[in-house]
Amino acid sequence: MKKYFAVLTGLFSFIIYLATLAPSVIQIDSGELSAVQATLGIAHPTGYPLFTLTGYLFSLIPLGLNKAFQLNLLAAVWCSLGTAVFTYTAKVMLDNIKKFSSPTIRQEQKKVHTKRKGKVKISDRDKISASNEPAEKTDKSKETRNYLTAVSAGLILAFSRTYWFQSTSVEVYSLQVFLFCLLIFSLVKAYIYEGDASDLKFKNPWLWFAFFLALGFSNHMTTLLILPGAAYLYFLKYRFSKKSFKSILPMLGVFFPILILLYLYLPIRASQSPVINWGNPVDLERFMRHITGKQYQVWLFSSGAAAKKQLGYFFTSLFSEFNVTLFIVIAGIAAIFFESRRIFIFLAICFLTTVLYSINYDINDIDSYFLLAYISISFFALFGVMKLSSFLKMGKNIYMISVLIIELFIIVQIYVNFSKVNQSYTYDFEDYTKALLKSTTKNAVIFSYQWDYFISPSYYFQNVENFRKDAVIIDKELLRRSWYYNQIRNSHPDAIKGIEPEIKLFLQALQPFERGENYNSAVLENLYRRIMTNLIT
């Protein structure tokens, strides 16, 4: 059983995830992303090619489920795999904790151990008893404790609110948490790796880190948040030298080809005019605009007030994330600070980088941007569990009490967060979208800006389930983007056939705006209103 501890932890979380899985699309981007995966389209910036390709392949498996539910199931799979990798990484970290300790801390620990040893008086009878006791008993006890500690930390992460919520429906962050866990695993293995970073060997974990990093960036740009922590561990191990910088080159040789290969999906697929073709990234200008998320940069580092608001939200929501296990986290922060300063600094860097970056993004659904911070917190919880389980030395009864407290805290966390994340009865967005479409006449033109509740779900129901494909749904805000007209032209050419002259004038006036050049806002607004008016007359 011990051999499969990480797999079993992931499997247990998957079973619980099934109970909270959404049966259909839910709010925000769920409908659009489900449609993109099912139809092999182009998603909103930054495109998410890895997410799209893996989702499309999974959607082809004949499971006998509706596509929305099947793709939601994939989200649960990603989160479960993330839990399994996290749990295994936690065990590796505990087994190699001395390798992460600085020489100063190791010397201090050795002095304390020697001092305590000198104070203990051992009788002849005790010596005989000790000599007969198997030497492996203590090691086996520690090994078992490490397994249980790693599993406990894995469950704390798996059932934290935001992490758990990613398992309920289609979103890019379910795959991202899996990739974050793989990145941290490869970093831990790389730090304890005895070979050179430039080794061109299959087992070199630094090359695996580069591979997972490329996968991460091809899924979501928040992958960059792992880089400061990675740099800390790398240069801590190899120091700043000419050789250490040259050793990065083989990693780049792995990173860039994989990244480029995956992102080539966007222009290749866009040139085939998929039904969902956000940004139409067929040329270099549109491609760069899309993968950099230029249209969303207006909300990034927008103001100090916004950052202060998001920071306040992060800390006030922490208890809602972890509930009573937050006390284990606090104990873990103190424990690892003294036990292994290097692990503490690595986790602190990941935590602070994530929080300080994410609070500067002024959006409502900010929680998922804190996921790497929540993973870091769960590693702190690992050492909190380790500290509590160390009470074994104080007697079996005290140890059992500490274990029961840990288990009780995790059960409370699962119980409280279950109702917060449960989407198993969520049909609201399907019912609302279908009811609205049913209420319209054939070939109706519907103007809307309700992305979260109607437009995004309609992408799925119209393009995957073929429900009321005759209706022309226009996102009035996306009419301000040049690529959107190409998408309408492909799906409903008759809808804009009579206003092509106005569209041509608008696109000419829009070009300098999209390029960040000087533009005439009055002309743009006038043409935009003319297009909307002519669409419904």
Tell me the role of every PLM-derived stretch.
Residues 2-27, 157-160, 220, 253-273, ...:
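Transmembrane signal-anchor helices characteristic of membrane glycosylation enzymes that use polyprenol
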Residues 21-33, 43-55, 275-280, 424-429, ...:
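Extracytoplasmic catalytic/substrate-binding loops of multi-pass membrane glycan-assembly enzymes
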Residues 36-39, 153-158, 205-219:
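Membrane-interface alpha helices of multi-pass inner-membrane proteins
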Residues 97, 169-177, 182-194, 205-208, ...:
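ER/secretory pathway lumenal C-terminal domains and tails of membrane proteins involved
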